């Protein structure tokens, strides 16, 4: 790779796949992990992994214990067109339709739409007097805006109020930052 460094570059696209421009090969990412929820318009249930030849070679030669990152069995099953479990067929049909919808809108338009929504969200958050976790506007994501709720305030009540008054649904964090 251009960095000539043995480290592998892993990218989590769970919140952004299908929402913002992403180029696994062109940007020389080694491992990309994505999911069906969020930008691909589906419920959770499908996972996507893109693996560079560098990452695959590291996998093959590593003597470290593997569990989650053990791609060997899945790669062998893929060669045979076999799933080692009951596939979520309904999600595959949904994914096919979601890809059709994104293609019909055009990815550039999809990305612009997410940018508009993200900017509107940040304007709203600022107007409510709340703090955006990311301090550098140049690093804002157009697929996720993390908002800090001041001590002594109830985030669930805030989300319900925003939904009831502004018809804007906000997700919840997984843990306290």
Task: Walk through the language-model features, giving the residues of each.
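Conserved active-site segment immediately N-terminal to the catalytic lysine
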Residues: 25-37
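Short glycine-/acidic-enriched loop or helix-start segments at secondary-structure transitions
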Residues: 19-22, 43-44, 137
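General beta-strand structural signal in soluble alpha/beta enzymes
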Residues: 9-13, 32-35, 42, 134, ...
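Conserved C-terminal alpha-helix-loop-beta "cap" of PLP-dependent enzymes
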Residues: 126, 130-177
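Catalytic PLP-binding core of fold-type I/II PLP enzymes
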Residues: 1-24
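Short coil/turn connectors at secondary-structure junctions
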Residues: 3-6, 27-29, 43-46, 166
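Active-site C-terminal subdomain of aminotransferase-like
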Residues: 37-123, 127
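Conserved hydrophobic/aromatic beta-strand scaffold that supports enzyme active sites
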Residues: 31, 46-50, 144-146
């Amino acid at each position: 790779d251009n960095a000539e460094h043995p480290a592998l570059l892993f990218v989590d696209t769970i919140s952004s796949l299908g929402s913002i421009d992403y180029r696994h090969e062109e940007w020389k990412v080694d491992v990309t992990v994505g999911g069906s929820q969020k930008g691909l318009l589906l419920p959770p249930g499908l996972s996507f992994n893109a693996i560079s030849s560098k990452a695959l070679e590291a996998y093959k030669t590593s003597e470290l214990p593997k569990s989650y990152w053990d791609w060997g069995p899945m790669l062998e099953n893929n060669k045979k067109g076999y799933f080692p479990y009951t596939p979520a067929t309904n999600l595959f049909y949904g994914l096919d339709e979601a890809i059709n919808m994104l293609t019909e809108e055009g990815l550039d338009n999809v990305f612009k739409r997410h940018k508009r929504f993200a900017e509107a969200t940040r304007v709203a958050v600022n107007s409510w007097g709340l703090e955006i976790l990311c301090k550098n506007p140049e690093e804002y994501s157009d697929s996720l805006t993390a908002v800090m709720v001041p001590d002594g305030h109830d985030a669930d009540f805030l989300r319900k109020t925003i939904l009831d008054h502004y018809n804007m649904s906000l997700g919840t964090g997984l843990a306290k930052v």
